[in-house]
UniProtKB/Swiss-Prot annotation:
Top-rank taxon: Bacteria
Lineage, uppermost ranks: Bacteria, Pseudomonadati, Bacteroidota, Bacteroidia, Bacteroidales
Protein name: Ribosome maturation factor RimP
Similarity comment text for this entry: Belongs to the RimP family.
Subcellular location, record wording: Cytoplasm
InterPro entries linked to this entry: Ribosome_maturation_RimP, RimP_C, RimP_N, RimP_N_sf
Function: Required for maturation of 30S ribosomal subunits.
GO biological process: ribosomal small subunit assembly; translation
Major location (coarse): cytoplasm
GO CC annotation: cytosol
Record-linked HAMAP family: RimP (MF_01077)
C-alpha cells in the first residue's frame, strides 16, 4: 500500500517555490490517491496536470498500481486548512456550529486558535418602532464548529 506520508512529501516537493498549498491527501486501502491543492486566486487545470505527472514520476506503477486524482479544494466545500481561512478574509462565509446554529457573515480575521465573522443582526433600539440591522463580530474556535465554507452569492 502506498503511504500517505510518501505522497505528502512528493506534493510538498512540487509545492516549493509555488503559491499553491496542500489542502488534503487521502490514500484508500485500494491505493486510490486523492490530492487537493488550493491557491488564493484559484487552481489552474494545467497545474493539476503538472502535479499529477510529477507524482507519477516519483511513484513506481510497476511496484504498486494506483489510481491518482489531483484537483482543487472545491468552491463551496468546507475549509480544511488555516490557509483557506486566510484567503477568504473579507469575503462572505457560512458557519455551522456544533450546536446546529447556521449563520453567514464576512470573515474578518483568523489565526491558529480562532476566527472572527462579522454578522448582521436585527436589534430594536429602545424607543424605536422597528428593529435595525447592526453589525456584530462573533468569535469561534475551530473546535466549536462543524464547518466553515465560502458563501457563493448570486446577487
Amino acid at each position: 500500500m502506498i503511504e500517505k506520508r510518501t505522497v505528502c512529501q512528493i506534493v510538498e516537493e512540487w509545492l516549493e517555490d509555488k503559491d499553491y498549498f496542500l489542502v488534503e491527501v487521502t490514500v484508500s486501502p485500494d491505493d486510490k490517491i486523492v490530492v487537493e491543492i488550493d491557491h488564493a486566486e484559484g487552481v489552474w487545470i494545467e497545474d493539476c496536470v503538472e502535479l499529477s505527472r510529477f507524482i507519477e514520476s516519483k511513484l513506481n506503477r510497476e511496484e504498486e498500481d494506483y489510481e491518482l486524482e489531483v484537483g482543487s479544494a472545491g468552491i463551496g466545500q468546507p475549509f480544511k486548512v488555516l490557509q483557506q481561512y486566510y484567503n477568504h478574509i473579507g469575503l462572505e462565509v457560512e458557519v455551522l456550529t456544533k450546536g446546529g446554529r447556521k449563520l453567514s457573515g464576512v470573515l474578518k480575521d483568523a489565526d491558529e486558535e480562532k476566527f472572527v465573522v462579522t454578522v448582521q443582526k436585527k436589534v430594536k433600539p429602545e424607543g424605536a418602532k422597528r428593529p435595525q440591522l447592526v453589525e456584530e463580530d462573533e468569535t469561534f474556535t475551530y473546535d466549536d464548529i462543524k464547518y466553515t465554507k465560502y458563501l457563493i452569492s448570486f446577487k
